[in-house]
Amino acid sequence: MPRLLILVAVLLLSGCLTAPPKQAAKPTLMPRAQSYKDLTHLPAPTGKIFVSVYNIQDETGQFKPYPASNFSTAVPQSATAMLVTALKDSRWFIPLERQGLQNLLNERKIIRAAQENGTVAMNNRIPLQSLTAANIMVEGSIIGYESNVKSGGVGARYFGIGADTQYQLDQIAVNLRVVNVSTGEILSSVNTSKTILSYEVQAGVFRFIDYQRLLEGEIGYTSNEPVMLCLMSAIETGVIFLINDGIDRGLWDLQNKADRQNDILVKYRELSVPPES
């Protein structure tokens, strides 16, 4: 009987075993969700629109819980760069540099000064063109981050041998809005959210198999969905909704009218009504 218990314990623990990485992963492109595939496979527009993005602020006021850090924010502060990337990847917009506008203006001043005193390099002898103005601005912010929206788990233990799993869901929410540069009118606005999954699996054994002989062992692992990827997915989804809403409102149009029945556009059109909480 003791041997049988040992065998069961070993099998139980080995079944939950996840081998730790032997070395750090090599640099690679950032993984992307289904929202990125949808964004990059949208039907073509009649013409691309010049758009400017200044600053997507974090309005959550959330910080990482102790003991991780009391000074690091709970959500990434790179939402502006993510939105610019999403707008460009959609092939519907031409983003104009606005986040680093001061750096761009300084560089142009250096070129003009060199042109005036005759010391300009060969690659900058052509007079600078005026900066392109945007037709619309995309404003927005990270409007919410809620931790432990839902949690749960399941487990079992028999004669000191058992296993359990637990999970937790957090949620991040983003607001995006399209603003007419000429009038300041808000043409379209959307709120999107994405859940963040964290889970833990562990197993262990704690049992006396003989007098003064104790068998004890445990193993487990945790997996946390990166907040950065969830924020990127929420922004990409928001851009798709803005494009779809703009088509319906006549703000912009498709190159091919028949593409209104495109599978991706139809899917997001059906999702335009928020689900009940």
UniProtKB/Swiss-Prot annotation:
Pfam family, one: CsgG
Topology class, membrane: Lipid-anchor
Database matches in PROSITE patterns: PROKAR_LIPOPROTEIN
Signal peptide range in chain numbering: 1-15
Lipid attachment locations (N-palmitoyl cysteine): C16
Cellular component, GO annotation: outer membrane-bounded periplasmic space; plasma membrane
General function of this protein: May be involved in the biogenesis of curli organelles.
Protein's UniProt name: Curli production assembly/transport component CsgG
Natural source organism: Salmonella typhimurium (strain LT2 / SGSC1412 / ATCC 700720)
Gene: csgG
